[in-house]
């Protein structure tokens, strides 16, 4: 039996996060699984869990890796067993499920969203996979609706723009776009050109070059129909809208997009997504991040996680570069501040527990 209480990072009454050693360990029922956390990663979303997004007492954190400690009675479909090394992304700071979050000694997840960590990857590398590959999968194959997928590639090698290719979501997107049979066209600073090429980018452009959009249009014969914006600012949206070909297309961001920019091209369909939508449950965060329960999203989540399992099993995807720190949950608080201050560049910040 596991202990009754645990240490975790939880929301405070004044909209912050603190370390607590008297938190409840998640109760395991149905198809849920209890995991002893071994490593966690800090993501930009963690920096946004402040103020009205904080539920007092709710556990924070999204990305984790660990060892299966207990399996619910109905968790029988995905061959998850006690002792398995697993990772995934869950929804931390969840007012509807406050005992579950990544930044804790123990966490829980439904069995279908768990990924088994292959032998060639460490817990620290596993902890970096969840948000990056789940969010980009949702963006590319649900929101943008790319024909084909990494297990059944498209027959036409269309160009797909990945803006911000050297980010963690960018390198994940480049790999998935290429595996799905498309040509990943990406942007980053020149110092990261070789990095994004190593992940499969077919062409790379310096977003600071004044001729960048013209060069992309020339390279793609003005035929980009799909754009994933991994940076998701007004400026990056304007860039993507200008780079999309004359026939229009689809644009997906990872944050709410500018309605003013959206109005500049009626032939481009904009959207923005959040990774937790794949759970299919209500996201009870303040507007504009509130979402109703959506069974169709949940079905996509089951489908996409199964795709990711096969990609991992066959060593077809690899994680973003990571920087590993020790010090446990107490140091995660410092890590959140470092991400907020943009002190970490080009790598995912991971902590061992």
Swiss-Prot record:
Q: Which reaction does it catalyse?
A: L-serine + 7 malonyl-CoA + acetyl-CoA + 2 S-adenosyl-L-methionine + ATP + 8 NADPH + 11 H(+) = (5S)-3-[(2E,6R,8E,10E,12E)-2,6-dimethyltetradeca-2,8,10,12-tetraenoyl]-5-(hydroxymethyl)pyrrolidine-2,4-dione + AMP + 2 S-adenosyl-L-homocysteine + 7 CO2 + diphosphate + 8 NADP(+) + 8 CoA + 6 H2O
Which Pfam family, an example, fits this chain? ADH_zinc_N
Keywords of the record, alphabetical order, are: NADP, Nucleotide-binding, Oxidoreductase
- Specify which residues bind NADP(+) according to the UniProt entry for this protein: 45-48, 166-169, 189-192, 207, 254-255, 344-345
Record has Cell division as a keyword: no
Pathway in which this enzyme or protein is active = Mycotoxin biosynthesis
InterPro entries attached here?
ADH-like_C, ADH-like_N, GroES-like_sf, NAD(P)-bd_dom_sf, PKS_ER, Trans-enoyl_RdTase-like
Record-listed E.C. numbers: 1.-.-.-
Class in the EC hierarchy, top level? oxidoreductase
Superkingdom as given in the UniProt entry: Eukaryota
Q: What happens when the gene is disrupted?
A: Results in the loss of production of equisetin and fusarisetin A.
SUPFAM superfamilies reported for this sequence: GroES-like (SSF50129), NAD(P)-binding Rossmann-fold domains (SSF51735)
GO molecular function annotations of the record: nucleotide binding; oxidoreductase activity, acting on NAD(P)H
- Residues binding substrate, per UniProt: 131-138, 275-279
PANTHER family in alphabetical order = HYPOTHETICAL OXIDOREDUCTASE (EUROFUNG), TRANS-ENOYL REDUCTASE STHE
UniProt similarity note: Belongs to the zinc-containing alcohol dehydrogenase family.
Q: How does it assemble?
A: Monomer.
What does this gene product do?
Trans-enoyl reductase; part of the gene cluster that mediates the biosynthesis of HIV-1 integrase inhibitor equisetin and of fusarisetin A, both trans-fused decalin-containing tetramic acids showing also antimicrobial activity. The PKS module of fsa1 together with the enoylreductase fsa3 catalyze the formation of the polyketide unit which is then conjugated to L-serine by the condensation domain of the fsa1 NRPS module. Activity of the Dieckmann cyclase domain (RED) results in release of the Dieckmann product intermediate.
Q: What is this protein called?
A: Trans-enoyl reductase fsa3
Please give the organism.
Fusarium sp. (strain FN080326)
Q: Which gene encodes it?
A: fsa3
């Amino acid at each position: 039996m596991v202990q009754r209480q645990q240490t975790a990072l939880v929301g405070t009454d004044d909209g912050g996060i603190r370390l607590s050693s008297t938190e409840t360990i998640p109760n395991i029922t149905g198809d849920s699984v209890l995991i002893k956390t071994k490593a966690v990663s800090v993501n930009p979303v963690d920096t946004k869990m402040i103020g009205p997004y904080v539920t007092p007492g709710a556990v924070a954190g999204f990305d984790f890796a660990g060892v299966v400690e207990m399996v619910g009675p109905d968790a029988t479909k995905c061959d998850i067993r006690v002792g398995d090394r697993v990772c995934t992304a869950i929804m931390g700071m969840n007012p509807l499920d406050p005992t579950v979050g990544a930044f804790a000694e123990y966490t829980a997840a439904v069995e279908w969203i768990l990924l088994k960590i292959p032998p060639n990857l460490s817990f620290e590398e596993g902890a970096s996979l969840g948000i990056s590959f789940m969010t980009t999968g949702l963006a590319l194959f649900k929101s943008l609706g790319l024909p084909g997928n990494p297990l059944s590639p498209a027959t036409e090698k269309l160009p797909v723009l990945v803006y911000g290719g050297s980010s963690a979501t960018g390198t994940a997107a480049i790999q998935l776009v290429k595996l799905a049979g498309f040509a990943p066209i990406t942007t980053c600073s020149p110092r990261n050109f070789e990095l994004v090429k190593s992940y499969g980018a077919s062409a790379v452009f310096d977003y600071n070059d004044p001729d960048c959009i013209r060069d992309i249009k020339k390279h793609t014969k003005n035929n980009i129909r799909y754009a994933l914006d991994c940076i998701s600012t007004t400026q990056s949206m304007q860039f993507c809208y200008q780079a999309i070909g004359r026939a229009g297309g689809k644009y997906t961001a990872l944050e709410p997009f500018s309605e003013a920019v959206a109005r500049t091209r009626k032939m481009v369909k904009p959207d923005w997504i959040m990774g937790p939508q794949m759970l299919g449950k209500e996201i009870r965060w303040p507007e504009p991040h509130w979402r109703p329960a959506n069974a169709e999203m949940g079905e996509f989540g089951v489908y996409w996680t199964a795709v990711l399992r096969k990609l991992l099993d066959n060593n077809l995807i690899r994680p973003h570069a990571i920087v590993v720190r020790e010090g446990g949950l107490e140091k995660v608080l410092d890590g959140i501040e470092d991400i907020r201050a943009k002190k970490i560049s080009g790598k995912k910040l991971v902590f061992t527990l």
